[in-house]
Amino acid sequence: MTTFSPREIVSELDRYIVGQHEAKRAVAIALRNRWRRQQLEPDLRDEVMPKNILMIGPTGVGKTEISRRLAKLAGAPFIKVEATKFTEVGYVGRDVEQIIRDLVEVGIGLVREKKRAEVQAKAHMSAEERVLDALVGATASPATRDSFRKKLRDGQLDDKEIDIEVADTGSGMPGGFEIPGMPGANIGVLNLSEMFGKAMGGRTKKVRTTVKDSYKELVRDESDKLIDNEAIQREAVRSAEDDGIVFLDEIDKIAARDGGMGAGVSREGVQRDLLPLVEGTTVSTKYGPVKTDHILFIASGAFHVSKPSDLLPELQGRLPIRVELRPLTKEDFRRILTEPEASLIRQYKALMETEDLKLDFTDDAIDALADVAVHLNSTVENIGARRLQTVMERVLDEISYNASDRAGVSVTIDAAYVREHVGDLANNTDLSRFIL
């Protein structure tokens, strides 16, 4: 897992997300506390529980983006789920324990990649031997093999096509059956296919590919022969238990809004099912039982219709750290357009450059774009930074359409150009409701 300090985590998030310093600080501290806990004595380590976070803020201000970037930074099993996808146990749909099963699967993938990297050199040598077998046959003389090995390493044979046999990882059966009342619903089918695969020595398939492309498949194949699957599973379960992070998006959508019956009952049921998960329980997975006591939960929601106090009191108590994300201002929109590494303006410039069309935005154009976005958010519906994409598409519609006919041309976009293309719509509220 990551050993970044909280300040380093925040500065890394700053590269992609504008503002929201308080939310970044909260997740940075929570992430660093995972590492701090690992340094403690075992007795005390078991007692230190993660402080779960609730992020509150309107749509389009960076809640989900913070989680996406955090996942890449974490270096630990991380899963983002929408709370609305789950239903109360006994209803048709996914139950909340599936979150933990998915988290373990993510852990398996992370640990496997790490183990593959450790045996990379050895696997590469074995892969080279298999490529030589495909090129000159297993019975070729050492002199012939050495001659071809030299050509292979010099890249002279990169484009030559060969037939290789690799493990067939695709299951012949569908992903599994949802069996009511059975935890880990689809484990039956997966275990059966694994058992048959092992009994028959593992299925292989023939693939025709170039020498250069074959290495990727063969190195992975050889790496998997060198690593111990049971050790990977044990390590992944431990990693999910100690370092796992679950990001629960749209938590406000399952908050009870009224005391009535109907769908609200099921929503409250999902909250009740989440309680033991967040508090700490044991979930059975096909890799063995997984304890959720030390998994960090970060919940987020816009809370437009409901309030955080509409959540079950027990669930509120299990989300002790509250962070409020503020709505975006005109200055924020300006910064979003220009500052992040993959800012919208940079993206559009790069897209147009593929057609050999040079795009330039003046400072007053950026001001005008931010003005239009703020105006529309205040008069139509506040959808945060996502409004900029709509406005940009509208402004650049004509340029994008004709770009292939204007190769070698330079286009400068200024405030007048922006107003000409979205000014009327932005001022006409009835029209902008439908178009922007």
Swiss-Prot record:
Cross-referenced Pfam families: AAA, AAA_2, ClpB_D2-small
InterPro entries in the record: AAA+_ATPase, ATP-dep_Clp_protease_ClpX, ATPase_AAA_core, Clp_ATPase_C, HslU, P-loop_NTPase
Subcellular location: Cytoplasm
Highest rank taxon of the organism: Bacteria
Signal peptide region: none
Gene Ontology terms: cellular component: HslUV protease complex
Residues bound to ATP: V18, G60, V61, G62, K63, T64, E65, D249, E314, R386
Annotated GO biological process: protein unfolding; proteolysis involved in protein catabolic process
Keywords, sorted A to Z: ATP-binding, Chaperone, Cytoplasm, Nucleotide-binding, Stress response
Subunit and interaction comment: A double ring-shaped homohexamer of HslV is capped on each side by a ring-shaped HslU homohexamer. The assembly of the HslU/HslV complex is dependent on binding of ATP.
Name assigned to this protein: ATP-dependent protease ATPase subunit HslU
